[in-house]
Structure formats: C-alpha cells, structure tokens
Amino acid sequence: MNIRSNPDTTRPAVTTGALPSSRKMFSAPDAAPDLRVPLREILLSEGAGEPNLPVYDTSGPYTDPNVIIDVNAGLPRTRLAWVKERGGVEEYDGREIKPEDNGNVGASHAAAAFKAHHKPLRGIGDAPITQLEFARAGIITKEMIYVAERENLGRKKQLERAEAALADGEAFGASVPAFITPEFVREEIARGRAIIPSNINHAELEPMIIGRNFLVKINANIGNSAVTSSVEEEVDKMVWAIRWGADTVMDLSTGRNIHTTREWILRNSPVPIGTVPIYQALEKCDGDPVKLTWELYRDTLVEQCEQGVDYFTIHAGVRLPYIHLTADRVTGIVSRGGSIMAKWCLAHHKESFLYTHFEEICDLMRKYDVSFSLGDGLRPGSIADANDRAQFAELETLGELTQIAWKKGCQVMIEGPGHVPMHKIKINMDKQLKECGEAPFYTLGPLTTDIAPGYDHITSGIGAAMIGWFGCAMLCYVTPKEHLGLPNRDDVKTGVITYKIAAHAADLAKGHPAAQLRDDALSRARFDFRWQDQFNLGLDPDTAVAFHDETLPKDAHKVAHFCSMCGPKFCSMKITQDVRDYAATLGDNEKAALYPDTAPKANDAAGVPEPSYRDQGMKEMSARFKEMGGNVYLDAEKVKESNRVL
C-alpha cells in the first residue's frame, strides 16, 4: 500500500508472560506435523497425583516465553505461506490511504502509522479462494487441520470418555462428535454450519472455527469513540481480551484514526478481527447518514479487505418495508448500523443499497475470504420488543441473503439479539436455524432483563449460557459499562470472564467431550484443599487469589484445610474427609459405616431378626461418643489415640 508517513511514534505497551502456573505448549496434527497448534498447560502441584491439564489458548505469542514481542513490528506472518502455497491469488499495490480514512484528523491528533507495510493479496479467477470453496471442492486446508487439532485440545482419541460425556448432555439436535477430524471440519464448512474467519491478508492469524458442533466461542468488542481512547489503549485492550479468552475481537471504532487503529490491531492480533464498515463510511461523510453512497461504502470495504479484516457486520436485512414495523416499539431501532441505514432509506425513500448491491458485496468479499456476519439491525433493545414482527422479518431476509452469499462462495454467520426474556430465547434459536439453514448464530447476550444498568454482563450472561446451550455458536460479550459508557481495561476482562463462564456452561450442557475435564480437576483440588491448584484451574486465578487473601493472606493458609467462609470446624469437605478417614480405620466394620442399609436377613433361633449393620454401627459409635466426653469436636490427639486402640 502507499501510506502517508507520520512523524509521531506509537509504542503501545501490552501485557505479556504466562498466566499463573501455566506454560505454552504446541501440538502437531498427524495430518500436518509441521503445524504448531497452541495450547495452554495448567501445571498442577506435586501432590495432585494427576497429569497437568491442557486447555484452549487464545493468547497468541504474548504468553510464549520464546517469542520476543515487538508491537511495532507486529506478529509473525505464518499464514502467508499457506495462502501462497494454495495459489489462486495475486499481490498488488492496493488503494492509497486517504485523509478521510482516518476522519480527516489534523496533524496534532494523528496517530503514528504502523511502520511495516505489506502489499495486499486478492483472489483471481475461478479457482477456490474461500474456506467454503475449498471445503466444497473436497480440499482440506491447513486452516481446517489446525482448527481440528485445536478443538480436540491436543488430546488423542479418548472415545469411551467422550461418548459418556455426549450421552450425559442435551445438544438440541447438534451433532458434536466424540473426536474432531479435519474431514469433519471440512464437511461442516461445506454444509455452511461452520466458518473459519480468515482473510487472506490476515497472515498473523491463528485460525479458529465457529459452529454449533464445536466449542462455543466468545467475542470481545473494543474500539475508540469520538470522545475517548487512543491507538495505544485499543491495542492493549485487544491483547488483554485474548489473554483472558476472547476468541475474536471486533474493532468498533467510531472516532479519529480509524484506519490507523485498525492496522495496529490487525498486525498484532492472532485472533480474527471483525468490523462494522458502515461506521467508518459514516465518518467519511461527516457523520451524516443521508450523504452515504454505495460507492463510498464499497471503497471502505476494499480498504478493510486489504488490511485483513476477517469478518464484516453488514446490516443488509434492514429494508425500507420493515422500518415502519419498529414504530410501536418501546425502544425503536437500537442498532447503530440499523439506525444509520433506516435513516438513509427514509431520507431517500429507497431500498437499502446494502440490500440492492448485496451480490456485488459478495463478489468483493470472496476475493479476500472475508466472512459475512449478517447484522441484526432491527434487534430488540428491550425485552418488551423481543420476538416482534420487525425482528423476525429481518431474520427471514437474512436467511435469503445467506443463500445468495453461499452461492457466491462466501462464509456466513448470522447476528442475533439483543434483549430477550428467558422463555423466549429458544424460539430465537429455533427460528434462526430454520430460516438461515443452520448457519452459525452469533448473539449479543441476550440480556434477560432490563433492570440492572451496571450489571448487564450478568443479565446477558444468563441469556448467553442458555442460547449457547440451545445451539448458538458464538457469544458477543457485554461488559458492566453496557448502556453507560465505553469499557476500559477492567471492564473488558470482566466481560470476557463472564462470557467464558457462559460458553463453558453451554459446552457442559451440550455434553462436549472435553468440557468437564477442567471442572472435575478443580473439584478434586477443592476437595483435597489444594488451594494453588484451585486458583490456577480457574478462569481468573488473580481474582481468586485476591479474594482468598483478603481474609487469609498467610502462606500457611494456602495449605490449610479450611477457608474463611466456614472456618476450621464447619468446613463440609473437611468433615467429609474426616468421615472417610475414620471409615478406613474400622477394619471389618468399614462396610457398616459406608453401607449402613445393608444388613443380615436371617433370624436367630427365637425368630428375632439379627441386628442390621446400621444398628450395630450406631450403638458402637454412640458408646464411643460418650466414652470420649460427649463433645461435638474432640482434641485431635485423643482421636488418634482412640483410633490406635481400634
């Protein structure tokens, strides 16, 4: 690209280094041993008596001690060789960056341009370019092999355990396999049930897959506004979000330096990056929706395709005939993109140019393998408006557009609400599957109540867990700042952790083969009072340690058999352990303690039933209780002495 240089220097500071008691590891797929698929291994204590636990890792090179991070140079461009190896692409100069791409920002507010520049690639001819086209042609790409290995969490086949987990879950028609193979990935993509968002110009990408038959994914939104944030803050928020588990990131910048901010993010992002191109297009016409044109919008698409954006939210379902359906709503049109297009349609009294030019948009996006995220511009902004005519009219149109995009060779996912009470959530999922041919569903929450500003990460996390269980493939996080302001670094982490909980809960309910391994490992650590393992197996070790240390800060408390909730005498798990320890000392009477309902059935010579094990055990323990003083809690030395006598 030809980029005008800027004399300023931007040096974003980002968080690096491993999470507590974790190390980066890589798995090599059998089908492509040259690939290095990242995992995070949680290191358990020596006393655990079980192997370390591998978990899915979205953090990229930022947690790899063998990689020197240079944000100014960007991440390694590993995928470039994969794309060129397949052929069917050409390198070209690309469009010149224009002042309006960054909002005509003045020199005093201009951010430094990213220094490393790469000529963009684009597809040529009729040869396969997109992952969908390769899948339909029966070709398994390196991206498909990569995500198959990633979904299996580096494990080889463990079919007995996997099949038991699947049998225990309720997947509502999803077909989660016991083991993910590259061929299964190819079939799901060819069918349109899954996508691998992977622009051929995002060479820094570590591929991931979105689909209802795979792990539920989460997205984190970042981006500046006209009143706050900077390039440095947004790059830092991106790295921070993926550290805690964001599978994709959307840059929703609406202020100055939009192009430059996006370039810095893309060159340093190992996860797919999504955008809403209409936001930047609006900035190019001074924020007036009436001035928008197809030509200006198309130019913005080209700009972002060349940079490497992996998926676009395009509100092509907001049609002129549907706008009046929102007139009686409590909250009208709450989508920014939806309201922009609604105003344009009414001002010109024309059908949306996104709808009328949709096939041209497909042809353009196909050249770069940019995936569609068909936007829900008429989503409900309050539970009073959930599942109304406007929402479902748009959804039906998105189903029609999905078929067009598929015919053009483009990957597609569908965006969903919004604000939906719990009893109406499954209706949304079922209708989306029906109308959109099982294309992956990607929802914002949904929020299940409107009464909790400041806590909408919780109101939406409830709905997110439910719709993820019902079949939603990716959940867009909501932070505590939703409806109140632009999220900061802490809000981003809170939103990501909340949605990791929701996604994992959905995976558990669906019976995903590997989901419960982490739960069980943490439960064993909890019962064994392995505090450090408890902290490290959790989604947020830092917060877990901080909460524990508020009341029990000493190192000795990290090995204590109690916490500050119950104390040493009332810990249920400690009492249970004591019971087990006692049962082990009973010798022949162990069965009486563990299985009190089993008893001899024979009568004695006089016809009187023999005492049951339970009766015998109860009498013995009653006598022993009295002998030892009749106290609920006893001196440990007395108990030991009594056990020796037994």
From Swiss-Prot:
Iron-sulfur as UniProt keyword: yes
Record: residues binding [4Fe-4S] cluster: 563, 566, 571
Cellular component terms per the entry's GO annotation: cytosol
Sample GO molecular function, one term: 4 iron, 4 sulfur cluster binding
GO biological process, one term: thiamine diphosphate biosynthetic process
Pathway in which this enzyme or protein is active: Cofactor biosynthesis; thiamine diphosphate biosynthesis
Superkingdom as given in the UniProt entry: Bacteria
Protein residues bound to Zn(2+): 419, 483
Catalytic activity: 5-amino-1-(5-phospho-beta-D-ribosyl)imidazole + S-adenosyl-L-methionine = 4-amino-2-methyl-5-(phosphooxymethyl)pyrimidine + CO + 5'-deoxyadenosine + formate + L-methionine + 3 H(+)
Signal peptide: none
Pfam families in the record: ThiC-associated (PF13667), ThiC_Rad_SAM (PF01964)
Listed InterPro entries: ThiC (IPR037509), ThiC-associated_dom (IPR025747), ThiC/Bza_core_dom (IPR038521), ThiC/BzaA/B (IPR002817)
Keywords of the record: 4Fe-4S, Iron, Iron-sulfur, Lyase, Metal-binding, S-adenosyl-L-methionine, Thiamine biosynthesis, Zinc
Obligatory cofactor(s): [4Fe-4S] cluster
Entry annotated with the keyword S-adenosyl-L-methionine: yes
UniProt region (Disordered), positions on chain: 1-30
Segments of skewed composition (Polar residues): 1-13
E.C. numbers: 4.1.99.17
Residues that hold substrate according to the record: 221, 250, 279, 315, 335-337, 376-379, 415, 442
Cofactor: how and how many bound: Binds 1 [4Fe-4S] cluster per subunit. The cluster is coordinated with 3 cysteines and an exchangeable S-adenosyl-L-methionine.
Assembly information from the UniProt record: Homodimer.
Family: Belongs to the ThiC family.
Main function: Catalyzes the synthesis of the hydroxymethylpyrimidine phosphate (HMP-P) moiety of thiamine from aminoimidazole ribotide (AIR) in a radical S-adenosyl-L-methionine (SAM)-dependent reaction.
Name under which the protein is recorded: Phosphomethylpyrimidine synthase
Source species of the chain: Nitrobacter winogradskyi (strain ATCC 25391 / DSM 10237 / CIP 104748 / NCIMB 11846 / Nb-255)
Taxonomy of the source species: Bacteria, Pseudomonadati, Pseudomonadota, Alphaproteobacteria, Hyphomicrobiales
